[in-house]
Amino acid sequence: ILCAYRDRLQALGETQHAAVDALLATQKVDDLGRETFEVRLDLQYQDAGKLLTGLVERKVPEPKTWTRSMANIMTAYDTATAFYEKEFKDDVADLRKFFGYLINRVKLIRVKTDSLARALKIFETINDRGVGLDAMDLLKNLLFMKADKAEFQTLKVGWKKLVDALHDAGEKPLRFLRYFILSAYGEQKLREDELYSWLVKNEEKVGYGADPAGFVDTLNEAANAYLNFMSGRSQDGKPHPALEAVQLLAGKATRQHMILFLAVRDLPDQVFSAICRDAENLMFAFLVTGQNFREFEVLFPAWAQRLASIKTLEAYEPVSASTFNKRRQELSERFHREFPVMRVDGLRKFQQRYLVARLTQAVDQAGFGSTSQGHVW
């Protein structure tokens, strides 16, 4: 707000803004008698602090170098600038009058605590009565409250890595957190607005209180696998035909199968691939018979822990029969009735591509025998 005000004054030809400069930064003298420039506000993350210093010094880094935190600060700066331009246009007197009101009438309360954990607790309480925080914000605060001071830097870096990776991939952090909990802890029904209360009640089960940094490492490992799965790759980033086929069928909107894949990500690849193929077949049966994919929100969490305990294909067969195959059999009669009269123009583009690819593969197998089990398109 202050940087935008100062820069708006300058854009209107005003050069007298020493009072604003003094609020933004201060000059200090070090032990060698040298004057040093210090921004008054010290941000938690280095990248955000770098941008704030750039705003104060009028040396903003190139946009291509911005992180998500830096972009958020610039969005706030641009919003403030747009407000000044809209409300006061070129009227310097009115603009200065607003600044006078802001500085002299708006009171900022500074709360000092004896520890960061206590500060975070107060922050959580204040925001419970004001700005709403989602489960990710609250979880971050909770982890810092549980961590030793020596862990703060490690925790800060790990958390930023997690959130940035999800945002950079266009993935909603809350959805990932919900799917992670459903996949890992045997929960079968949990809404996004229930995540934080669930975590508080299950501290011992999850283990974040005893090892906050370790829990963030686990989240990062799961998020890396999750994002690779969304791209049709194995959790170590390698091409995976069975996963690619599922993702081609699922498109960008359907993600419930990620609950299963997160739960079984450490199984032997033969078992993991078999689960992928069964998930693909069930999804296709749902597509042909017009079933709502939201049913997977019920089925997959219910199956996740059972599937995660399987180590061999032999052990998987009876489980597959009582889960995926059982549900497919329930749809069998309708599937055989609907598939012959299915219209391609009734499908979305990505579903059309999937269907054509699978039909082409079936023709190749019928005409030439064994074909490559690689890509299905």
Regions found by a protein language model. Name each.
Residues 7-12, 129-133, 267-271, 289, ...:
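Secondary-structure transition/capping motifs at alpha-helix termini
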Residues 1, 373-377:
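Histidine-centered nuclease catalytic patch
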Residues 89, 107, 128, 136-360:
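A cross-family structural signal marking well-folded subdomains
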Residues 2-189:
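Glycine- and hydrophobic-rich flexible loops that cap the catalytic core of alpha/beta enzyme folds
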Residues 95-98, 108-110, 245-251, 369-374:
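Generic recognition of flexible, low-complexity loop/linker segments
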Residues 1-2, 194:
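Conserved long hydrophobic alpha-helices within structured protein cores
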Residues 364-365:
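Short, compositionally biased pre-sequence/patch detector
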